[in-house]
């Protein structure tokens, strides 16, 4: 599955996670990407979309 939203271009972000003793370990934060059938330029197409775009109505789902 793709790790980037095709609508808002949101992708994986890298950073550092701190434990209770303040030791660091590298990790990534991935967006919640869903595979959705949506209307793109008048035709239904399968796209990878983050849930933020789905909830905000930036994507019209094909039913």
Swiss-Prot record:
Record flagged with keyword Ribonucleoprotein: yes
Annotated signal peptide: none
Disulfide feature: none
Pfam families referenced in this protein's UniProt entry, alphabetically: Ribosomal_L28
Keyword flag Ribosomal protein: yes
GO MF term list: structural constituent of ribosome
Record-level GO cellular component terms: ribonucleoprotein complex; ribosome
Keyword tags: Ribonucleoprotein, Ribosomal protein
Gene Ontology BP annotations: translation
Alphabetized NCBIfam families for the sequence: L28
Family recorded in the similarity comment: Belongs to the bacterial ribosomal protein bL28 family.
Name the record gives this protein: Large ribosomal subunit protein bL28
Origin species: Clostridium perfringens (strain ATCC 13124 / DSM 756 / JCM 1290 / NCIMB 6125 / NCTC 8237 / Type A)
Gene: rpmB
């Amino acid at each position: 599955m793709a790790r980037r939203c095709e609508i808002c271009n949101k992708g994986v972000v890298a950073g550092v996670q701190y434990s209770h003793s303040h030791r660091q370990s590298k990790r990534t934060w991935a967006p919640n990407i869903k595979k959705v059938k949506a209307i793109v330029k008048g035709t239904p197409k399968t796209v990878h979309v983050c849930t933020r775009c789905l909830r905000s109505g930036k994507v019209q789902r094909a039913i």
